């Protein structure tokens, strides 16, 4: 989800959009006619999606910490991705009018620091939680569970089950 947010403008340039139109409609945004930078409504929708992505990252951290500490390789793989995703979400939040993924790309030094810290703390769940809190500091956070509409289930059927409208996902080409 983080890469979808980061790469929104590159995807758009090649004729693809993976953002949920249902969510952006609430902000008065038609993704098919979106100008570069998107404007205020688009940025508000992106902030909401950052909150949802942040919630997913927290769930992924909980899952990762269920992996035994002796399984250093798989933990490290997951932790690097989680740390970089959190830092990328912060960059997107800090630069809401970005028009290219390169403008919100995590620096090489931040990548190296994320890897070093994750490697150091890989077996220490409490330290990993503190590191994640630092990486995710200031990010909005969607509340509660974040259900996703299963593939093949139309939005109307999903809404009928009383799933929160702001949490519906969609995608595809524009």
PLM regions with names:
Residues 10-174:
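Catalytic cores of Mg2+-dependent Asp-rich isoprenoid enzymes
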Residues 1-13:
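Acidic (Asp/Glu-rich) catalytic motifs at the cytosolic membrane interface
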């Amino acid at each position: 989800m983080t890469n979808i947010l980061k790469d929104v403008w590159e995807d758009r340039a090649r004729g693809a959009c993976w953002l949920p139109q249902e969510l952006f409609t609430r902000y008065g945004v038609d993704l098919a006619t979106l100008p570069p930078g998107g404007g205020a409504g688009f940025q508000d929708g992106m902030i909401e999606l950052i909150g949802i992505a942040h919630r997913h990252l927290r769930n992924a951290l909980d899952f990762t910490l269920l992996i035994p500490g002796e399984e250093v390789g798989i933990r490290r793989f997951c932790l690097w991705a989680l740390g970089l995703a959190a830092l990328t979400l912060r960059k997107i939040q800090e630069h809401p009018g970005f028009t290219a993924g390169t403008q919100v790309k995590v620096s090489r030094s931040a990548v190296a620091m994320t890897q070093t810290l994750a490697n150091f703390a890989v077996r220490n769940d409490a330290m990993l939680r503190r590191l994640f809190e630092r990486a995710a500091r200031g990010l909005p956070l969607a509340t509660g569970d974040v259900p996703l509409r299963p593939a093949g289930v139309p939005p109307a059927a999903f809404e009928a089950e009383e799933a929160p409208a702001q949490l519906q996902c969609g995608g595809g080409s524009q």
